[in-house]
Amino acid sequence: MSDNMQDTNGVLVQGHIKIFDPESQKVYINKRNAIHYENMSIAMAESLANAGEGFIYEMSFGNGGTSVDPTGIITYLTPNSTGTNASLYNQTYTKVVDDRSVNNTDPARNKLETRHVSGTNYTDIVVSCLLDYGEPNGQDA
């Protein structure tokens, strides 16, 4: 084997978020979403080495990342995606999406799926998280 051999394929991670009403199918948001690359690299290494907690367990929600002025203009703050302690601006709610966890109260609708097409060099992870009527409890819609 040659010492000059290099694998240049690399790894590409892209985030995407789609928020929609499951009853009416109305789509509210369908766009690219920020990735925390340092945490993703740690998660991938821990998953492949079967060491630590490099898996998706929960989805967190919050506020403070956007503001709306009196004329309706929406301003988005820069995502907190640097440093291992980076987090949402103001986390207000968390829901378990690991459908193998005993802490998941609705694994049929809050779940993880992998989707792969044979012959391609990518696999999608689809995270489904349903915020039902009255969730989060005590917060206005």
Show the residue positions of the predicted features.
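Small cysteine-rich, disulfide-bonded extracellular modules of the LU/uPAR three-finger superfamily
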Residues: 1-141
